[in-house]
Each structure stands twice: as C-alpha cells, then as structure tokens.
C-alpha cells in the first residue's frame, strides 16, 4: 500500500528525535494524514507479511472491540497482544470496545442539559451506558446524511489515570453518494506495528458497517497526531539524537526504491549494538519493496454482534516476507 509507505517516508524524513514514557526513543512527526480508497481492495500491508498469526490477532482483536468487553479473558485465549496492559484477571484500565458499546453518561446532569432516559433505544439495560455502535448503525439506516455519526473511546476522567488510554480514540462515519467513508483520529501512532493493524481493523469495520446499512464501502481516512517510529533505547536511541539529520540527508537523496536499502546498509554500519527496539532498519526495508496487489475481504452476512473469526475471509493475499519489530511498552 503506497499510502503507508509515503507515511513511513514522511515520518523518517521530516520527524524529530523525541524521548517518551516507554524508555524507547522515537523519531516523531506531527499530524500526518492520508486516505485509502477501499474500492481498490482491502488495505492489508503487502510489504511485510500480515497473514498467519498476525491476521489471527487482528481479527480476534476486532471482534473483541465489537463485544464491548472491558477485560481480555476471552481475547487472551487467542492472542497475547494485550497481555502487557492487563492485570492477572485480564482487566484493563481502558478498553476500546467498552466505550464503543457501553459509554457511561452522568447520573446527574447540569441544568439545561439533555440526556436520554433509561428506556431510550441506545441505552443499555441495567446500566447507565450508551451503545455508540448501535447508534451509528441506526443513524446510517435512518439518517445517513447526518454529520454526527461519531464514535468516541476517549473518556477524559478515565484517560487521565489510565495506564494506556486509547490511541485511536475517535472515528466518524460519513456518507457521500452511495458510499460509506470512515475517518479515524489517533492521538499516537506506532508506525511500524500499530498503524498497520489500525488501517486494517477500521477498514474492516467500514466494510462490515457498509454491508449492514446497504452502502458501498468508500474511503478510510486517517489522521495521526503523534506519528512515531521507535528507534531504540540507551546508546542506540541516543545515536539518533545526534545523527538524525545525517539519516534524513540520505533519505532526501533517494531516487529509487532500491536506494532505501543503501540507506539501511549505511545505518547498520553506523549505529551501536542493541537494535531490538529500533524499527528504522525494518521500515527502510519495507520502503525498498514494491507493494503487491491488495487482497479482497469477505464478511459473512449476519448480525454484527454474531460475527466470529471464521466469518471474515481474506482472499488473494500475497506479501513480501515478514519483518519482526519489538513492542515498546
């Protein structure tokens, strides 16, 4: 997917050295935006392998979002990608799906405010929470021209004290003609590991929602406020603080995809040992690879809440070999 490669090049070429809470340093760029036309195929990366166990994790995470669960007790039976942020009983400080499907609203509103009563169709029984996904589905069926079809996973009071508040925190459905588009806003984006999952998950969501509301799928648009590439810790990370400009000078001189490998070779001769958390070499390798044709996705025609792993089928997927990146926690 060329849009992803352009994003990678943009962050590496224009970003600045930036330490952060994880202890793994980054090359960070402000406010990157791109759009992907989903009519041209499903945007699962082909410049590195994303099927197999990666696809398994992606789909089970997506279904977990839709479940509305605030814990990972079922999810961890299929994938361990959330284990680092959960307690021994699988509970999370913040869970995306919990806010998608069960967003809390105050018991005592201020004078003049308007809130739904307990028997409102989007209010969940037995708790004062609001089902944003059902709201979006109903609005798309009944009022598709609405500019208010917003789903939000950011609760300020929760985010202020959470171990890991939502990174991809808000998305908007927007209909143009007969096509359903989705725009995702993300406060923080790990370019090597997180963003490829985000692109695929929200494109899958757009596909599934479009199918259930009788629209053609349109575009996935993505805005990432802090777009970052992890570049290592200790001496490895510190090297980028001193030498990022030299790397960017070489990137500015690249005239063909193959020349990214020359930059990678230069980098590997200059950097100190300890590359485990350095994502830059792997991303340079991806930049040197030609994107292959996008695959197709098929989602079973059944209620959204009844979807299971086997109901999502990836077809005609071919990719370059996998690249391993270590997660910065």
Show which residues each predicted segment covers.
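Terminal, non-catalytic protein-protein interaction segments that mediate quaternary/complex assembly
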Residues: 1-329
């Amino acid at each position: 997917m060329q849009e992803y490669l352009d994003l990678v090049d943009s962050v590496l070429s224009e970003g600045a050295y930036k330490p952060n809470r994880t202890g793994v340093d980054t090359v960070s760029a402000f406010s990157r935006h791109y759009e992907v036309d989903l009519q041209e195929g499903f945007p699962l990366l082909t410049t590195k392998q994303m099927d197999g166990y990666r696809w398994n994790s992606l789909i089970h995470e997506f279904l977990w979002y839709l479940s509305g669960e605030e814990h990972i007790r079922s999810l961890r039976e299929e994938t361990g990608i959330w284990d680092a942020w959960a307690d021994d009983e699988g509970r999370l400080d913040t869970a995306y799906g919990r806010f998608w499907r069960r967003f809390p609203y105050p018991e005592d509103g201020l004078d003049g405010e308007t809130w739904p009563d307990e028997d409102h169709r989007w209010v969940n029984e037995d708790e004062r929470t609001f089902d944003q996904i059902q709201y979006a589905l109903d609005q798309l069926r009944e009022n598709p021209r609405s500019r208010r079809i917003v789903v939000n996973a950011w609760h300020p009071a929760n985010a202020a004290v959470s171990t890991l508040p939502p990174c991809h925190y808000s998305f908007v459905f927007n209909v143009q003609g007969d096509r359903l588009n989705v725009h995702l806003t993300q406060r923080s984006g790990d370019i090597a590991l997180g963003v490829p999952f985000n692109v695929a998950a929200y494109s899958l969501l757009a596909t599934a929602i479009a199918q259930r509301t009788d629209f053609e799928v349109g575009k996935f648009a993505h805005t990432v406020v802090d777009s970052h590439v992890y570049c290592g810790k200790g001496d490895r990370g510190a090297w980028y603080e001193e030498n990022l400009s030299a790397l960017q000078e070489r990137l500015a001189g690249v005239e063909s995809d193959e020349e990214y490998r020359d930059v990678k070779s230069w980098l590997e001769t200059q950097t100190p040992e300890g590359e485990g958390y350095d994502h830059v070499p792997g991303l340079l390798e991806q930049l040197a690879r030609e994107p292959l044709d996008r695959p197709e996705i098929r989602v079973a025609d059944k209620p959204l809440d009844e979807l299971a792993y086997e109901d999502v089928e990836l077809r005609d997927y071919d990719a370059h070999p996998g690249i391993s990146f270590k997660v910065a926690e």
